[in-house]
């Protein structure tokens, strides 16, 4: 396993060096290598940076995202993938690095040192971990990029990701699709309205976002986030609360096809889907009746994590299901309690 060290100053940091894992490129199969060799243009149109954040529990699902992204995206571009983490198993990293190839590079970036100054202020609940906050570090860590995509690891890419990247953000900070998890339940709609002070129809899901990194730096977004994090703790939708509050009025609303969840008023046909996002407890590795699960398993079968992922599904118990139900009920109760607070965010601070 070959490792390189990149000075943090080159990435906008002032700490010691950060380790970025970049093994030699691996061949994922003769047919795919031949396709890339013969089908991909030699002169690429540009580079598309894509960021992920994960821990050991979710890393196997990243393989599905990468597999589907590679299969469905234009090879007219180079893709640079960065996996932000705070301690991923070496064997897991090695498996993911087998997707590393010409025009499709992957680097693991440990953000542990970056996390320390704000760690005590982060609030995590049930299945959330601190990885959900990693996306706020991207603009400061990677000054070489003015624009980038961020994606959660529980996604399946069915459209050309280059099309998403080329949306014109203008002066907007973020491009995101409406959050179907919020708009499918009245208590969450009320929460966004009364606690965040936002229109739930325009509340975006942060699991697939197009980021204007140049504007983030110019507006000192990280400093604004760190300040708000110390002043108020959003406990329900957490990092998405912060992002939506801080980016309000500067969000490009993307078609929901780019972040379609299993919940929502209707189902999109395969030809209309671009990215499927298995939000909240709607996980195909836990349940066998999740909408769009066929796309998840289609790509899961092609990965080296398939046995592990299918074992999670097969070993899911009634106790796990009851735990999910209890978690859903608890979250709704928490949302209602936040709505009822006399010192809720919007009641105290008003419009950001």
What is each model feature region?
Residues 158-187:
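Conserved donor-nucleotide/metal-binding helix-loop-beta segment in metal-dependent transferases, i.e.
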Residues 152-156:
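The conserved acidic donor/metal-binding loop of glycosyltransferases
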Residues 80-87, 176-177:
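Short internal beta-strands
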Residues 59-74:
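Histidine-anchored nucleotide/phosphate-binding helix
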Residues 49-52, 69, 80-82:
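Hydrophobic targeting segments
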Residues 100-138:
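Active-site-proximal specificity loops/subdomain of glycosyltransferases
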Residues 148:
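Short aromatic/hydrophobic "clamp" motif used to bind/position activated sugar donors
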Residues 1-35, 39-48, 54, 61-64, ...:
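A glycosyltransferase accessory/donor-loop signature
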């Amino acid at each position: 396993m070959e490792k390189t060290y990149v000075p943090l100053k080159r990435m906008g940091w002032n700490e010691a060096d950060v380790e970025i894992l970049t093994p030699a490129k691996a061949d994922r199969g003769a047919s795919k290598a031949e396709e890339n060799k013969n089908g991909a243009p030699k002169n690429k149109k540009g580079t598309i940076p894509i960021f992920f954040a994960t821990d050991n529990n979710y890393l196997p699902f990243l393989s599905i995202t990468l597999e589907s992204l590679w299969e469905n995206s234009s090879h007219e571009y180079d893709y640079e993938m960065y996996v932000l983490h705070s301690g991923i198993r070496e064997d897991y990293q090695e498996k993911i690095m087998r997707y590393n190839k010409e025009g499709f590079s992957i680097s693991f970036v440990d953000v542990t040192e970056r996390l320390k100054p704000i760690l005590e202020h982060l609030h995590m609940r049930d299945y959330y971990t601190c990885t959900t906050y990693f996306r706020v570090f991207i603009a400061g860590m990677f000054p070489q990029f003015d624009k980038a995509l961020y994606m959660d690891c529980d996604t399946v890419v069915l459209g050309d990701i280059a099309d998403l990247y080329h949306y014109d953000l203008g002066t907007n900070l973020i491009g995101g699709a409406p959050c179907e998890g919020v708009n499918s339940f009245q208590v969450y709609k009320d929460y966004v309205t009364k606690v965040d002070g936002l229109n739930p129809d325009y509340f975006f899901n942060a699991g697939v976002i197009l980021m204007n990194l140049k504007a983030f730096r110019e507006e000192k977004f990280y400093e604004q986030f760190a300040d708000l994090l110390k002043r108020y703790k959003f406990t329900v939708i957490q990092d998405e609360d912060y992002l939506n509050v801080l980016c309000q009025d500067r969000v490009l609303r993307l078609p929901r096809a780019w972040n379609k969840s299993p919940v929502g008023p209707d189902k999109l046909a395969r030809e209309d889907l671009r990215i499927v996002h298995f939000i909240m407890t709607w996980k195909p590795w836990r349940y066998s009746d999740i909408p769009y699960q066929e796309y998840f398993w289609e790509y899961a079968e092609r990965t080296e994590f398939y046995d592990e992922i299918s074992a999670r599904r097969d070993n899911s118990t009634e106790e796990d299901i009851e735990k999910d139900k209890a978690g859903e009920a608890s979250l709704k109760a928490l949302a209602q309690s936040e709505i009822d607070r006399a010192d809720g965010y919007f009641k105290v601070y008003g419009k950001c």
